[in-house]
Structure formats: structure tokens, C-alpha cells
């Protein structure tokens, strides 16, 4: 993986963390920093804040029952995109982080569809991610993506624990 791919994957992870939990507009700060030239000094406090958010989530759910699923935001669709790319021998496939970024946008769409989020969230995230240089276009159709989601090994009794976005800084886990 080249440095560009690593930076994009890290950018997706940072933004994802602040979509999950954000009390100090770290999401907005991250957008501003990630959209410009690489500035490690400006990014470092945000990376530290994101690590604290993730550690707090993991520590609050040592038995991996519900809250610990929250950092999987975007992964259900992201893994489906990766599976689809592999199954279709896609040349130059998205990296894991890039697929998760697109998965977050799709999770926002699903959140809107189920009235968990207000309309416009997915479009906002798509514009934000694009602004930061992340890929935002799905490599497959919606139907192909849904078929790939059904391949997810984490499905219990045909249902998945899915992380939905209520708004930036607030998510919820529901079985679908």
C-alpha cells in the first residue's frame, strides 16, 4: 500500500470516529485540515482525540455486546464493497479505508431511508469526503451491494447488527 492509500485510509478512520462521537467539532476541524496540504502538527491532536474516543467505546463494553460495535460504522457496506471487488476481479480496487468511507455514505443513506437521520446527511458526507480526497462513488450498483451485504458472515439469523448515523456525533446500533 502506498503512502497516499495509507493517508486516505487514515483520513476515513479519523472522520468515521468523529461521526460516531464529536463534542468539540473535531469533525469540522478534521475536514479543514484533511482538505489541505498534509499538516502533521495540526492532525496530531485530532488523532489523539480520536484514539481516546475509540478507547472509551471499547472500555465501556468489554464483553462486545453493543457499544463496541459502534466503531464498525461503514464496515458492513465497506466489507461488501471489498467482497464485490474481489469477486469481480476489479483492477485497482478501493483500499479497506476507502471502501469503509463509501460504506459510511451508504450507512447514512440507509439511516435516511429508515428515518433515523434527516434527509441530506448522506449528501453532506459524500461532499465532505470528496472535499478531503476520499473516493465517494460506489464501484457497483445498489442491488449488487445489497447482494454482497447478504454475504456478511456476522449475520445472525439473517439479521445484521448495523450502525446507523442519527447525525454527526451520534450513532445507534440496530438489527436489520
Segments from the language model and where they lie:
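Phosphate-handling active-site elements
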Residues: 85-97, 113-119
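Short glycine/serine- and small hydrophobic-enriched flexible loop segments
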Residues: 13, 83, 105-113
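Carboxylate- and glycine-rich phosphate/diphosphate-binding segment that chelates Mg2+/Mn2+
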Residues: 4-71
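Residue-level signal for inorganic ion chemistry
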Residues: 75, 104, 168
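Catalytic, metal-anchored helix/loop core of enzyme active sites in primary metabolism
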Residues: 60-62, 85, 174
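C-terminal charged capping/lid subdomain of soluble metabolic enzymes
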Residues: 12-16, 116-176
Amino acid at each position: 500500500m502506498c503512502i497516499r492509500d495509507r493517508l486516505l485510509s487514515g483520513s476515513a478512520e479519523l472522520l468515521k470516529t468523529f461521526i460516531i462521537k464529536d463534542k468539540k467539532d473535531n469533525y469540522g476541524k478534521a475536514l479543514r485540515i484533511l482538505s489541505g496540504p498534509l499538516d502533521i502538527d495540526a492532525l496530531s491532536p485530532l488523532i489523539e482525540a480520536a484514539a481516546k474516543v475509540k478507547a472509551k467505546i471499547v472500555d465501556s463494553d468489554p464483553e462486545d455486546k453493543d457499544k463496541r460495535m459502534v466503531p464498525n460504522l461503514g464496515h458492513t457496506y465497506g466489507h461488501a464493497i471489498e467482497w464485490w471487488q474481489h469477486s469481480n476481479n476489479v483492477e485497482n480496487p478501493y483500499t479497506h479505508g476507502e471502501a469503509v468511507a463509501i460504506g459510511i455514505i451508504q450507512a447514512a443513506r440507509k439511516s435516511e431511508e429508515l428515518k433515523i437521520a434527516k434527509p441530506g446527511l448522506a449528501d453532506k458526507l459524500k461532499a465532505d469526503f470528496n472535499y478531503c480526497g476520499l473516493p465517494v462513488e460506489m464501484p457497483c450498483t445498489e442491488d449488487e451491494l445489497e447482494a454482497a451485504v447478504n454475504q456478511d458472515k456476522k449475520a445472525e439469523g439473517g439479521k445484521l447488527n448495523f450502525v446507523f448515523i442519527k447525525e454527526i456525533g451520534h450513532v445507534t446500533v440496530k438489527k436489520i
